[in-house]
């Protein structure tokens, strides 16, 4: 079952925690690639100095953040790595959740090819498939073409995992500071990174 529009509404920190354990799905050339979300970061612009929308900054890149919740915000870092975010909060409130890491589930062969251009990989390479925001976008084939796409679409969405299959019973949710935001002054210390403690696909312990 796809997460309905209402799933993305409400407090961004709560939406971030609700995303843990759900499945991010991208259909590429008719083939399903997916992974269970195991690590996220919340960004609460315009008061959050780590957010692209801090101070109400509104640009062509950030415009989607000001729109309806439940849309994809994709951007590039270092000119080469894509990052995938879920827009949250009401229209006009530019907030979102960065998906930092996944446990790969569907389309494993396609994911391996996307990451390493081969299907025979080592155990270390397997653990490295989707344990970071740029890695998971490469693995799932998410690019700037997906910016602004509704997460109600057939090709890009979040699937709600049934309670009996949900991994939340196996892992404790831990909160801590977000990663690589040294520029963000006091916001550096906000405990808005949420992840499953001990999960092998978390990007940073």
From Swiss-Prot:
A Gene Ontology molecular function term of the record: DNA binding
InterPro entries, A to Z: Formyl_transferase-like_C_sf (IPR011034), MPG (IPR003180), MPG_sf (IPR036995)
UniProt keywords, alphabetically: DNA damage, DNA repair, Hydrolase
Gene Ontology process terms (BP): base-excision repair
Disulphide linkage map: none
Primary enzyme class: hydrolase
Gene3D superfamilies in the cross-refs: Methylpurine-DNA glycosylase (MPG)
EC number annotated for this UniProt entry: 3.2.2.-
NCBIfam families named in the record: 3mg (TIGR00567), PRK00802.1-1 (NF002001), PRK00802.1-3 (NF002003)
PANTHER family hit by this protein: DNA-3-METHYLADENINE GLYCOSYLASE
Family per record: Belongs to the DNA glycosylase MPG family.
Protein name per the record: Putative 3-methyladenine DNA glycosylase
């Amino acid at each position: 079952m796809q997460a309905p529009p209402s799933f993305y509404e409400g407090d961004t920190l709560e939406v971030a925690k609700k995303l843990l354990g759900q499945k991010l799905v991208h259909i590429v050339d008719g083939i399903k690639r997916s992974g269970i979300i195991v690590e996220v970061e919340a960004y609460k612009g315009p008061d959050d100095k780590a957010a692209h929308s801090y101070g109400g900054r509104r640009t062509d890149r950030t415009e989607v953040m000001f729109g309806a919740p439940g849309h994809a915000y994709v951007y590039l870092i270092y000119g080469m790595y894509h990052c995938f975010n879920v827009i949250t909060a009401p229209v006009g409130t530019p907030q979102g959740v960065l998906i930092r890491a996944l446990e790969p589930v569907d389309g494993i062969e396609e994911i391996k090819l996307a990451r390493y251009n081969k299907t025979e990989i080592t155990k270390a390479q397997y653990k490295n498939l989707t344990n970071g925001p740029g890695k998971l976008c490469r693995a799932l084939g998410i690019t700037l073409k997906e910016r602004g796409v509704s997460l109600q679409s057939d090709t890009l969405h979040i699937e709600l995992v049934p309670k009996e299959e949900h991994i939340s019973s196996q892992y404790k949710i831990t909160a801590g500071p977000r990663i690589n935001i040294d520029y963000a002054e006091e916001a550096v210390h906000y405990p808005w990174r949420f992840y499953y403690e001990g999960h092998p696909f978390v990007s940073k312990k």
